[in-house]
């Protein structure tokens, strides 16, 4: 799935050296005239969105959600945009992550008012739109080339984005922007292709606007919209959303679970175990920053020993985006065999836009796999790793059981809500599967360590898990 993600220098060179009779300004002017100028726009329709990095296994597309209604308001003059949608479950039965299953209808709103601190990847929501691209191309001294794809000739405008990646826009012979592509940094995939295609243009009040929009990241769609209504150049009022509280960086903290066994919090949870000659870490999640904090805390708690293994519960990006940091550390990744080809590629993907520790270290990844069960022991400590069966979240989902401590670490099957929250009815099939696996394996569990640890840092017991699925007596 990753072969299209690599931006080859040959492709960029082809765009740069191709001669073309018109200059870039003429192409921009002609396209702007043909499409109509936009200062603001409000468009609406329906379609699908997809959760990147949350596929049921690494060979499958991102899981789908239904956008029953979708509306986006954009201001190109004073850069800002707002998205409003009503979202529903799209995978039945649930397959993959992305906070599935969605029960009923879920209303989502997102507002961005562009400032000097707005990440470029967010700004691209404006500047990859057809008219937005033309405006950005004009402001950033775009160059012009020509390219023929499938027998069709395109004028290709190129400028450099704030992240130093090329942004290419393909203008067809009708002077319509048909495709915009660029590359953005992804913790797993590195220099990842991000492209948007626009088709079925129609006239709305003198402005040509696509009625089909498809965005892709990581070779699979992340958005697929059919547009039914467009209001060009209307008055818009996009106000910044209220700033979320608690913006301070999280600090890694720890709790002793047993002799030589430590829970590391301050983000996604991990466990560090003091083996005789080395350290085992369970879970390398979120980001290089979080993985570095886990590594530092593990070495502080267990000084003088290397981290030999890191257990990966599954390949979803939020649970795997720290693995490259562990690879740079020299640790071997333990994962289910379904993930091995993908994680091997992850360990070798170029990260030139935002070089990480592995990009700098140039180390070859070391990966060990398991199928149904794997036991790690030094004769004192024991970690039992089990493949979870009957769960649609991920085909290679692993849970880690420490029999001596009667502790079970699990990811995404049970994400505890506030202590006074009402249990869902019906329970999530993922949580039911977790309980079924615990009972199938006859594990003597007292304490659950969810990787998505509760915000109040409370101890999560097996009894709490059982109550959450409606078995109030805890049995």
Task: Give residue spans per PLM region.
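Sec/Tat signal peptide C-region and signal peptidase I cleavage site
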Residues: 17-21
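Flexible, processing/modification-adjacent segments and terminal tails
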Residues: 22-27, 94-167, 172-173, 184-192, ...
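N-terminal mature ectodomain segment of secretory-pathway/periplasmic proteins
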Residues: 26-116, 140-148, 288
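Gly/Pro-enriched, hydrophobic low-complexity segments
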Residues: 152-241, 398-403, 410-411, 416-417, ...
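Divalent-metal (often Zn2+) His-rich catalytic cores of metallo-beta-lactamase-fold enzymes
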Residues: 214, 435-475
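Zn-dependent metallo-beta-lactamase
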Residues: 222-275
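Conserved beta-strand hairpin/beta-sheet module of binuclear metal-dependent hydrolase folds
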Residues: 255-297, 397-416
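Active-site metal-binding motif and surrounding structural segment of the metallo-beta-lactamase
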Residues: 289-334, 440-446
């Amino acid at each position: 799935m990753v072969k299209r993600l690599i931006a080859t220098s040959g492709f960029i060179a082809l765009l740069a050296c191709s001669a073309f009779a018109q200059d870039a300004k003429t192409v921009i002017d002609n396209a702007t005239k043909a499409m109509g100028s936009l200062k603001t726009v409000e468009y609406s329709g329906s379609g699908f969105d997809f959760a990147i990095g949350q596929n049921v296994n690494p060979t499958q597309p991102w899981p789908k959600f239904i956008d029953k209604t979708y509306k986006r308001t954009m201001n190109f003059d004073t850069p800002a945009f707002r998205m409003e949608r009503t979202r529903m479950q799209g995978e039945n039965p649930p397959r993959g992550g992305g906070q599935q299953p969605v029960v009923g209808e879920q209303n989502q709103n997102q507002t961005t008012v562009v400032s000097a601190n707005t990440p470029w990847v967010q700004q691209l929501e404006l500047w990859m739109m057809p008219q937005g691209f033309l405006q950005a191309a004009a402001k950033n001294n775009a160059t012009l080339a020509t390219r023929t794809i499938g027998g069709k000739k395109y004028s290709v405008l190129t400028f450099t984005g704030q992240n130093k990646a090329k942004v290419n826009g393909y203008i067809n012979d009708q002077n319509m922007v048909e495709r915009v592509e660029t590359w953005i940094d992804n913790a797993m995939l590195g220099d990842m292709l991000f492209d948007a295609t626009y088709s079925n243009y129609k006239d709305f009040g003198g402005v040509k606007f696509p009625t089909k929009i498809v965005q892709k990241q990581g070779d699979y769609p992340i958005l697929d919209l059919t547009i039914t209504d467009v209001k060009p150049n209307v008055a818009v009022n996009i106000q910044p959303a209220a700033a979320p509280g608690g913006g301070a960086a999280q600090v890694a903290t720890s709790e002793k679970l047993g002799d030589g066994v430590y829970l590391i919090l301050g983000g996604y949870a991990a466990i560090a175990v003091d083996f005789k000659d080395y350290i085992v870490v369970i879970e390398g999640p979120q980001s290089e920053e979080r993985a570095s904090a886990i590594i530092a805390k593990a070495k502080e708690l267990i000084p003088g020993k290397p981290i030999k293994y890191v257990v990966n519960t599954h390949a979803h990006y939020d649970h795997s985006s720290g693995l490259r940091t562990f690879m740079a550390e020299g640790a071997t990744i333990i994962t289910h065999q379904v993930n091995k080809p993908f994680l091997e590629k992850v360990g070798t993907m170029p990260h030139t836009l935002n070089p990480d520790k592995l990009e700098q270290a140039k180390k070859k990844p070391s990966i060990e796999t398991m199928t149904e069960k794997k036991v790690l022991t030094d004769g004192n400590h024991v970690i039992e790793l089990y493949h979870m069966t009957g769960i649609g979240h991920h085909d290679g989902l692993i849970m880690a059981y420490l029999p001596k401590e009667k502790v079970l670490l699990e990811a995404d099957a049970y994400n505890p809500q506030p202590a006074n929250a009402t249990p869902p009815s019906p329970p999530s099939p993922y949580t039911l599967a977790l309980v079924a696996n615990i009972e199938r394996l006859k594990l003597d569990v007292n304490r659950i360590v969810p990787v998505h640890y509760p915000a109040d840092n409370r101890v999560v017991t097996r009894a709490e898990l059982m109550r959450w699925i409606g078995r109030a007596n805890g049995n």
